[in-house]
Structure formats: C-alpha cells, structure tokens
Swiss-Prot record:
The entry's keywords: ATP-binding, Kinase, Lactose metabolism, Nucleotide-binding, Transferase
Protein family membership: Belongs to the carbohydrate kinase PfkB family. LacC subfamily.
UniProt organism field: Streptococcus pneumoniae (strain ATCC 700669 / Spain 23F-1)
Highest taxon of source: Bacteria
Top class in the EC scheme: transferase
Protein name as annotated: Tagatose-6-phosphate kinase
C-alpha cells in the first residue's frame, strides 16, 4: 500500500463562465467542487491505476469534512483533524483564460504539528511506500518535511517527495534524505542559484552537486522533451511521443503516482520511468486534473524509450 500525504489540501471550486464581468454579478450554472491538493491528485491516479492507497494529511472544519467525504470510496482515508478550516481554491474559467483565487489556508498550531508526527508514525506500519506532495501550511516549520522523511527512514519506507522552495531546500540540507525527488529545471535553478538548461551533460553535472548527495533517485521533467533521471550512479533519458495536450495541470502529480507505484512493485529502472511518464502524459489528455484513462495506458507505454546516457 502507498501512503499519500497532503499537508495543505483544499476544496477546488471551478466556475466556468463565457465571460468574466468585472464590478458586477456573474452567475455560474455548472459549479464543480473536488477534493484538491497535489497529494490528492496522486491519490486519485494511484486508485485509478489499481494500486492500494491510504490518504492522510491535515483537515479542519466543515470544509475538511466535505473534502474527506469527496475522496473516492475505494481510497482508504486517515486524516488528522485540526482547529483551523480547510481552504478553498477557486478557478474561474472564462473563455480561454483561467483566473485563480487561492486562500492561504489554516494556521497549524505547534501541538497539532507534533501530534501529526505521531499519527504519521503509526500509519507507516501499514504501508510500503510514502508519497509527500505540495506546500506546507502556515504554522509548521520549514523543515517539517525533513521530520516526516526521518520517521519514514527509521521505519524503512521509501519516500517520494514532491515539493519546492524552502521546504525542499530544508530537506536537501537535512541528514534525512528522501528516496526520490522530482524537480523541474526551474526548481533546480532556484536551488542552485543559477540557470540550469536542458543540456544532458549539464544536467549530469548538476545532479552530482553535493546538495543532492544521498538521494537515490532524482527525476527531472523536461516537458515535451521527456525526462532525465539519475539513479545511484546511472543516468537515463526517457524519450516520449508527441501527444495532444488537453490539460497539463496535475501531470507532475500523476508522474509521482507512477514513481510511487514503481517503487511499490519493485520494478526495474526502465519500468519505473516509463510508468511514471505514461501516467503523467495520460493526465495531460484529460480535462479533469489528477485523472487518467487506463484504456490508453498500454498503447502509450509501448511508445516510450529509455536510454542509459
């Protein structure tokens, strides 16, 4: 079973409009509300793929109750309740544009943060792989993910970590390393304080920087150009076919689902990388974020090429 962790989930509300009129009333007929957050996108894709998944994280108030109720019934759930209210994230779809209004979310009390660590520690007993995704809510220290990784390491569970900014920096500087990180070029540039290109020789050098020491897998998305990856001392390039993209949002989360599944099933390097890329690509072909059509899985799988470089 895979444990997904979403520390700052949301109710994602979609308002489709023909036109967004400013300083007047806009009436919405077709409102969509879903359980949102990067970790919950991972959860959905794992469930659709057919893997057993347990979802956890922080929820609060009536919106938190709504969120848990609207996670697929096939998914096991064991969230931790806090005093603050789970946030709303609103997307206004008008014409070809998308305007987002994102609430900050609850401020987590120090004791709640400590109590969740104990909650997380207990959940580790029943899972084989951990996937941690997204931002930290206000109130938690910047090195909180390092604490989660430490507990998972102590329990012997591999961790796939998908976060960015100060939270990722804190983990990289910690002695407690995740099994997998999944930065893109922009995030690599942020971490190193210099521009990083998609040149394979440069990426090889970058991924051997001391900052990344001790991390077993580093998987870098190159968008339409595929993926570059380092596993131990071996480097890989994944070539992908051109596809029709409908909605790219959530493709990174779907990739995390594939990585986590590959670790769960102890697949070869090539199998893990292909699965991760295929699930990410399938997500881009759907309107709904964090959703894959498994009927198209094998045909796409057969088109991907993994090369050692």
């Amino acid at each position: 079973m895979i444990l997904t962790v979403t520390m700052n989930p949301s109710i994602d509300i979609s308002y489709p409009l023909d036109e967004l009129k400013i300083d007047t009333v806009n009436r919405v007929v077709d409102v969509t509300k879903t359980a949102g957050g990067k970790g919950l996108n991972v959860t959905r894709v794992l469930s659709e793929f057919g893997d057993s998944v347990l979802a956890t994280g922080l929820v609060g108030g009536k919106l938190g109750e709504f969120l848990v109720e609207h996670i697929d019934n096939q998914v096991k759930k064991d969230f931790f309740s806090i005093q603050g209210e789970t946030r709303n994230c609103i997307a206004i779809l008008h014409g070809d544009n998308q305007t987002e209004v994102l609430e900050k979310g609850p401020e987590v009390l120090e004791q709640e943060g400590q109590d969740f660590l104990e909650h997380f520690k207990k959940l580790l007993e029943s899972v084989e792989v951990v996937a941690i995704s997204g931002s930290l809510p206000a109130g938690l220290p910047v090195d909180y993910y390092a604490s989660l990784v430490e507990l998972a390491n102590q329990a012997g569970k591999p961790v796939v970590l998908d976060c960015s900014g100060a939270a990722l920096q804190a983990v990289l500087e910690s002695p407690h390393k995740p099994t997998v990180i999944k930065p893109n070029n922009e995030e690599l540039s942020q971490l190193l304080g210099r521009e990083v290109s998609e040149d394979l020789d440069e990426l090889k050098e970058v991924l051997q920087e001391p900052l990344f020491a001790g991390i077993e897998w580093i998987i870098v998305s190159l968008g339409a150009n595929g993926t570059f990856a380092k596993h131990g001392d071996t480097f890989y390039k994944v070539d992908i076919p051109r596809i029709q993209v409908v909605n790219p949002v959530g493709s990174g989360d779907s990739t995390v689902a594939g990585i986590s599944s590959g670790l769960l099933h102890k697949e070869s390097d090539a199998e893990l990388l292909i699965k991760a890329n295929v699930l990410g690509m399938l997500n881009t072909q759907e309107k709904m974020t964090g959703h894959v059509n498994m009927a198209n899985y094998q045909a796409l799988y057969d088109q991907l090429i993994v090369k050692e470089v």
